[in-house]
From Swiss-Prot:
Family: Belongs to the UPF0509 family.
A family per Pfam: YciZ
Name used for this protein in its record: UPF0509 protein Ent638_2183
Species this chain originates from: Enterobacter sp. (strain 638)
Amino acid sequence: MSEIDAQKVAQRIDTVLDILVAGDYHSAIRNLEILKSELLDHTNAGNTADSAQPKAPWEV
């Protein structure tokens, strides 16, 4: 498994912040969802879905 490049993650977070400042909240949220998905895929490459935390009621 490769290491997570913190610099690239920070750059992507900066991009999301720029999108938020521009007022495009939908795109910012979508970019955060993509980043989250990629990070989880990276860290859970060998894990099963059974170990996932249950979702809070507002996330269901």
